[in-house]
């Protein structure tokens, strides 16, 4: 029964990620600004690295299948998995702290968003990495504090509402 409950919570987070990414985002060919990171970060808090990674990757694949915007590229699925795993490493069974949030968001910004995703976009578009990187660097500089503030606020809210205690009993 406990595993079923975890799967239900995971499905809910996948659904939220798809809705936040596909409907509540601004997207150009090389930049997407949205809030799909919130359910992915919360998955890291609730389920740990591996299950959060599954939520991230599944969200990417299902989102692309249900609401395609261009060709499917597995590199972005890998990026979604890696980003979610990083959230899980920094947030699962940990106390809320600004330092943890800044480290997680910083590593995801540099490793996933600026490095991996820029490489994937270069492969897909053929544009020079330098050109893509400059545009993406501006976007990431704007989004970094937004991500950090929103994730920290969500984590504090989850902590106050004792949601983690309720979910933790299903993870054992």
From Swiss-Prot:
Gene3D superfamilies: 1.10.1760.20. GO terms for cellular component: plasma membrane. Keywords: Cell membrane, Folate-binding, Membrane, Transmembrane, Transmembrane helix, Transport. Its main location: membrane. It is found in: Cell membrane. It comes from the Bacteria. GO terms for molecular function: folic acid binding; transmembrane transporter activity. InterPro entries: ECF_S_folate_fam, ECF_trnsprt_substrate-spec. It is a multi-pass membrane protein. The chain crosses the membrane at residues 6-26, 35-55, 71-91, 101-121, 131-151. The keyword Membrane applies. Folate-binding protein that interacts with the energy-coupling factor (ECF) ABC-transporter complex. Unlike classic ABC transporters this ECF transporter provides the energy necessary to transport a number of different substrates. The substrates themselves are bound by transmembrane, not extracytoplasmic soluble proteins. Forms a stable energy-coupling factor (ECF) transporter complex composed of a membrane-embedded substrate-binding protein (S component), two ATP-binding proteins (A components) and a transmembrane protein (T component). This is Folate transporter FolT.
């Amino acid at each position: 029964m406990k595993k079923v409950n975890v799967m239900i919570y995971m499905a809910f987070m996948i659904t939220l990620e798809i809705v936040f990414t596909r409907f509540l985002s601004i997207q150009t060919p090389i930049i997407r600004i949205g809030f799909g990171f919130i359910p992915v970060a919360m998955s890291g808090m609730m389920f740990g690295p591996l299950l959060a990674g599954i939520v991230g990757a599944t969200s990417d694949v299902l989102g692309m299948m249900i609401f395609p915007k261009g060709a499917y590229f597995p590199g972005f699925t890998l990026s979604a998995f890696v980003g979610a795993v990083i959230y899980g490493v920094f947030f699962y069974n940990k106390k809320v702290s600004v330092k943890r949030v800044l480290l997680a968001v910083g590593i995801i910004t540099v490793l996933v968003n600026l490095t991996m995703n820029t490489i994937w976009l270069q492969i897909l578009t053929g544009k020079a990495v330098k050109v893509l990187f400059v545009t993406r660097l501006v976007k990431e500089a704007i989004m970094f504090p937004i991500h950090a503030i929103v994730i920290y606020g969500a984590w504090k809210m989850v902590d106050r509402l004792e949601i983690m205690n309720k979910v933790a009993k299903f993870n054992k």
